[in-house]
């Protein structure tokens, strides 16, 4: 039995392959092929444009796939969300689908869009949003380079943005956010009802999320004199249960803890001052709570 | 006054810029910009996806543009064809939009497509063709990589092909040709009725076509003894009027002629045998008949 | 005293340097040089074509080298195999030297090769194989691109293949396997009899194999309630002795185990279900059993 | 409050960013920008030519910066050295500023430079050195490619060298060493007197040095039968305090130690012979003693 | 006898080599060398930073060199200008050295610079300009990236600009132009007084300028019926003397003329309308009036 | 009927394709293919290692091919030389096969090679040369990087050199030249006896040599007052017959001549001084005398 999985071709492909490799699945593909081989005989992978994956998952051509919430909605795909996966982005901010106009446009809010022309790659999501806001506008499909179409070709655009820097570079001003989007491991409904496929998907989710969690975390080990242990433990984040083991023939203990990487820059100097010795930090591949 | 011209962004861009440079128009653009500068104050150029240019020409946002006949038809754009331009292709064959199925499919002809699913980037052109052939099929928009969708995702595709080699590499078989397509310089109807814009467009057509014609031609000069002139002229292609000038203080004449490059490989050995001396071939930038 | 070691120049070089770096030996070489510097004063490294290394090891110009079994045999080199090293390949399948013919050739088996012409980079190995099979054929040295020579230039080829995909792409059919080959750390016989050199080579083998073993393995740590320990241990592969340590002031134990990476995808979900907490996976650089 | 930090633009930039990432600070910068963003709201980073950083630190435009001792001296910058950082070099040798002449020059020692012309990027440091040696020579500023100016343009050069290979390739001979230089984290004097900034700088130094220390070290774990422990401990470097923990229900102990990577190649074979089992080596990200 | 010529290393090198190739001098250089070989035994070429060439020409180490007027002035080099060469620029505008401040600075004119700090690569030229304008400011040498130093590090900069786009991208405003600069072939005064060297330099100037002139010009040939000749000649630019030759046995004439390329786009359509046939345009390598 | 032609794959391929394009034959090949398509239905082209082409021409598998004289001799191929083609080299010197030893070797002449070991890619040619010189040495086949084998692996090498710079960089000294080699268009003897194939080959030779001749030549045109014509003609190289035509209604004549490019740098200044006006130089594609 095999699980048929659609993964995004193109700009996300390398990041996706790296995530799967870290999760334990090695994908290899020849340059122009769309059918990678994978070192798990229970998986069959197809590369596709992210835009199309939810449609084919919905229709059952694929058991499951990775794509953004934006494209799941645009395809009106009725699928099961198995896991939320945040990767391959340059900031921790979510990706947003926003409506933007020229800086000097007199369109100030969504209601000003009545009767205007809007270019977007996500026509249906945009139309639905406008309808819900009681706005009647002409929404046209944009094949790309959407952000340069204002103001010469259209009055406004609905476009994906992460940091807003491309919008700023094109002198655009955001007037509304249609939705926030992250990558979803999503499944076909029938496939989800198959027990073998559901367990396979749940295991996949555990491994992928374990890999992502490990990216923002590090392992920390240190040796602590017995009488400094309480001080040290007080410094460590409360919710983390450190692993403490007694050293042989000694009144020192070894303390080991998993931390978020961004805490380390404050903790290491503090631990050192509090009497910890031989602090080492080591990298992690997976973290499962 | 300015003529607003849409040129294709992407894979055709470099070839288009080279053609315009040869025609006398130097376009320069910074890497992420869509608004090249051009050394002709009467032109304003916008880079766009070729798919969208006919739509914006039709609507009058652009006065004119370069795009394929396929996309003019897909956009149902009612525009004026100013010139046919054949460039940036690896063979002299026209580009074709064909319907293809898996080699081992039992779909043999268009009529077998009834009730089938077809993926294509050119949905309307394909639907129109099927309708005209009395076929009722489901045509879905493909965001790319169309040729790998058969047979897993769809039964057939309608895709652009030049040499057929990508179809062959994907084990596909052509069952019908929907249309042949070349690049067209096409104009908005109102712009065409403006005398200044029409003359500007006609001049542009002369220069672009003069540049393309020069690519397949070379200049040939040779010195010929007076008594061999008739023999030499008999060898040269009949329709070409060579330029003959008498040399000073000599009974030799200089013969100069413009030829198609592919004739040269047979003519040069023949001319040499017939008594021509000092044959030189030189490159051309434009040829206007 | 120094050990003189030949390493393969060219396509294997980067992978070899990475393996040595992981094993603890940093090699640096300027772009056109063949004499890398190495951070071990007891080693002297020469880069060479893999084809030539066994010959120079055999002759004692080098104490030892890395090359494939195929080239050791082709050079008829009488050397000591110190270690088998599997690296720098895209699949876990061994590399094979096979005899292949055109798909539509009427050569079906080795005996059909009588009187035929065969191109190969490994002339002697091929001749020996044919002789042992009672076949009399003309074997010619091929400087490269061997797989395109059938059927225009020769009747069959003897060529190296890993996945068979290049053979398939050239419409070739395998009719026999001459040998399977892996990379060997091999030594000159006299050098091997020198105690200092032998120990240096054995240590090198331990480190290189420890590095390779680590590539397919990961470290796994988890915290386990005392009463779940037996369940957890039952899930872990039997032959692996996990390291179990008691946590201070707690009835939990820490379990640590080294596993093959390909087992992890099944074990992690199972361990979690069985009550393990805070499972972390971390990367390894060397594993010595 | 923010600490304003100058980092070197150019050839050192990537290595610097990698070091900071390992230390826990992620810097991202768009291709032509000089103001990277950093995931620490207490830091403000500016990219600059290494030559200029000490000047701006001295003047208080920056609180601190990274630059070589050579440029601190050339700028006559009166700054506080916070930490010595050795990174981004191909060898462990220090970088030296040397005076070099043509191989066949009759300049043999510093005193022979009297009345000669010397090209260098470090004019003041060179002038000071000559003055201290009682030599009167003409020192001119070199914009680059200093090593090819001898002998046609100048008599000698004062240039930075690491391995000496570029000097050798240009047929130059070193006659004196002006100074040895490493990268310094250095601070403005007033900033150093501010308690918040001083602590921030000290923490930064701990993390950067912890990252650098980790690059040359590895973690080693092994299981040891109780009766072999003393033998094993005798093999391990004396100054390192290994972490020893008793295994549950067993008379084995787990021994864990942090070692310099260059010791490993001798220790692993020795430990194995002495009875250690399941030796694993794992990578480290930070080591704080 | 040889002429020793300094050519700019770096960003201008490729353009300079192309210009010399077109002028008839083929320069070849191995990647890290500064001494190209040239196919003229009378030339000896040295590659150098453009900043240093005028200094070495002034001092007689070189007979002549190519560098900008800006660097000739900065070096206070007393040299002979042999030829003005405009090449390797993206626009026909001259390069300018300008003083720029932040857009929102309250420095509005040169006189506002009193007491301010200015960064520049051309310290002496800037100081001289300020002195002549009665301004007393602190001018500091900038090693690069000058345009990002305003406003954090300095109050103003003096920097080279061609299109002004880098200044605009850094939100800078030009308040004064110090000088306009083009590339000069300049000679040492003594070398210029040597008759052989002077003639060599004059010939070099003719060839380099002939090559540059040819870049903006094309050759045009056409056949014209005798009775249309006057009309055609009236269309052609007055100052150009066309070459007219009578065709054999015909009342047509061949007209040939050299034109500036930018005239061609208007002339070709006009000539065609006026009765010219077989118009061809061909490229030129040198044009000497 | 088709002529089957072998062209060199690899480093010479691009230069060969450019030469054929200039000669009028456009070759296109997909990245991994060995069978280019060509716009001449009478040609069938195969790409091969240059080393193997003469063997397959000799055996009649190919009608003709391009390869060096060195490989024709090494293959002991009995073929017809159709044309000598000098292209794709960085200098006008011929390529030479030389015997080289270490600079400090005491091998001074060929006779000192008795009993020595020599590595070379051209074993037979080298053996024949040694035999003819009465020397008995061991010649071994080198798979590449031959020049670094001296002195550690062999006593001498026989290697191809063009400028000698690689030999110099490896501290080698040339003691003998075995042969000089250029690229030959060579034909199978039977193919040459076929009249159609012989004419096709002769035409090909005319076009290829015409293209090569054009690379070193330019066209020069100028206008000359009638009374200066003799002076001008006296300056032009004697053997070249210039084309002189009388200008209409004028006492000026137009002079046109084909020159070697290396003459132009002296002639243009001289012609200008002698009264020529409007001198233009234009590029050539073919020159057939």
UniProtKB/Swiss-Prot annotation, chains A, B, C, D, E, F:
Reaction(s) the record says it catalyses: 1-(5-phospho-beta-D-ribosyl)-ATP + diphosphate = 5-phospho-alpha-D-ribose 1-diphosphate + ATP
Location in the cell: Cytoplasm
Regulation: Feedback inhibited by histidine.
UniProt xrefs under CDD domains: PBP2_HisGL3
Pathway recorded for this protein: Amino-acid biosynthesis; L-histidine biosynthesis; L-histidine from 5-phospho-alpha-D-ribose 1-diphosphate: step 1/9
Cofactor: Mg(2+)
GO cellular component: a single term: cytoplasm
UniProt entry keywords in alphabetical sequence: Amino-acid biosynthesis, ATP-binding, Cytoplasm, Glycosyltransferase, Histidine biosynthesis, Magnesium, Metal-binding, Nucleotide-binding, Transferase
GO molecular function annotation: ATP binding; ATP phosphoribosyltransferase activity; magnesium ion binding
Record-linked Gene3D superfamilies: 3.30.70.120, Periplasmic binding protein-like II (3.40.190.10)
Pfam families in the cross-refs: HisG, HisG_C
Class of this enzyme: transferase
EC number: 2.4.2.17
Any one Gene Ontology BP term: L-histidine biosynthetic process
Keyword field contains Nucleotide-binding: yes
Lineage: superkingdom: Bacteria
Family: Belongs to the ATP phosphoribosyltransferase family. Long subfamily.
Task of the protein: Catalyzes the condensation of ATP and 5-phosphoribose 1-diphosphate to form N'-(5'-phosphoribosyl)-ATP (PR-ATP). Has a crucial role in the pathway because the rate of histidine biosynthesis seems to be controlled primarily by regulation of HisG enzymatic activity.
Xref: PANTHER family: ATP PHOSPHORIBOSYLTRANSFERASE (PTHR21403:SF10), ATP PHOSPHORIBOSYLTRANSFERASE ATP-PRTASE (PTHR21403)
NCBIfam families noted in UniProt: hisG, HisG_C-term
Protein name: ATP phosphoribosyltransferase
């Amino acid at each position: 039995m095999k699980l048929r999985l659609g993964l995004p071709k193109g700009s996300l492909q390398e990041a996706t392959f790296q995530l799967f490799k870290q999760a334990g699945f090695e994908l290899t593909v020849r340059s122009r092929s769309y059918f990678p081989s994978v070192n798990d005989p229970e998986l069959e992978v197809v590369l596709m444009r992210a835009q199309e994956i939810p449609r084919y998952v919905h229709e059952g051509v694929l058991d499951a796939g990775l794509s953004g919430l934006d494209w799941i909605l645009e395809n009106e795909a009725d699928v099961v969300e198995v896991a939320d996966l945040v990767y391959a982005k340059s900031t921790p901010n979510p990706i947003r689908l926003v409506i933007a106009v020229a800086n000097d446009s007199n369109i100030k809010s969504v209601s000003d869009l009545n009767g205007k022309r809007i270019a977007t790659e996500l026509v249906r999501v945009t139309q639905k949003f406008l309808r819900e806001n009681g706005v009647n506008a002409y929404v046209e499909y944009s094949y790309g380079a959407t952000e340069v179409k204002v103001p010469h070709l259209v009055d406004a655009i609905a476009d994906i943005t992460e940091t807003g820097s491309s919008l700023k570079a094109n002198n655009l001003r955001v007037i509304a956010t249609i939705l926030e989007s992250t990558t979803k491991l999503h499944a076909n409904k029938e496939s989800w009802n198959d027990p073998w496929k559901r367990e396979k998907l749940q295991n996949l989710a555990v491994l992928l999320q374990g890999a992502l969690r490990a990216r923002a975390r590090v392992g920390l080990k240190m040796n602590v004199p017995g009488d400094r242990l309480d001080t040290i433990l007080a410094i460590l984040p409360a919710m983390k249960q450190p692993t403490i083991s007694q050293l042989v023939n000694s009144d020192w203990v070894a303390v080991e803890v998993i931390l978020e990487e961004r805490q380390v820059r404050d903790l290491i100097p503090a631990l050192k001052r509090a009497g910890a010795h031989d602090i080492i930090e080591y990298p992690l591949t997976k973290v499962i709570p």
